[in-house]
Amino acid sequence: MTTSAPRKTVNFITGNQNKLAEVQAILEPTIEVQSQKLDLIEVQGTLEEVTLDKVRRAAEQVEGPVLVEDTCLCFNALKGLPGPYIKWFMESIGHDGLNNLLAAYEDKSAQAVCTFGYSAGPGSEPILFQGITEGKIVPPRGPPFFGWDAIFEYEGQTYAEMDKAEKNKISHRGKALEKLQAWFAQREN
């Protein structure tokens, strides 16, 4: 009789139900995703600096293993802005305002960047997993329910117009989680 190894469980620190649903859709059933909301103050810095700080503080608060995520939307014409501050830009100016930022520029290209940080617990060196998807910024199309999905176009469709499974295969988040899955699989072998 062969027994399989117990399924790996991660404690994903988020209060965003859309992010949680995407992470669960990509990782489960291979990796069980539990969720916990913590109020973590985000430092200002690069995406990597923000993620490292967040994962270290989350591991200390939870006193155990955690997974955190930070996302950027980088406009090439604006040398990477809004970058890691996209959440605050979205809350302040919305889809139309983000499009207006690029109104004076011919270049509408952008990068969607997702960085997950995993820590085995307090004092453990965090590991980062990053995914990038190239696209462009367009006027909003599709349901406006998940951040900037309605204005980020990849190969003719905005994220918001895509089927969820299709989006998860090509998205910045999906690419980062693929790296996380590979890392966990390598550690089991």
UniProtKB/Swiss-Prot annotation:
Mg(2+) binds at residue 42. It is an enzyme of class 3 (hydrolase). Its main location: cytoplasm. Its cofactor is Mg(2+); Mn(2+). Homodimer. Belongs to the HAM1 NTPase family. This is Inosine triphosphate pyrophosphatase. It comes from Pyricularia oryzae (strain 70-15 / ATCC MYA-4617 / FGSC 8958).
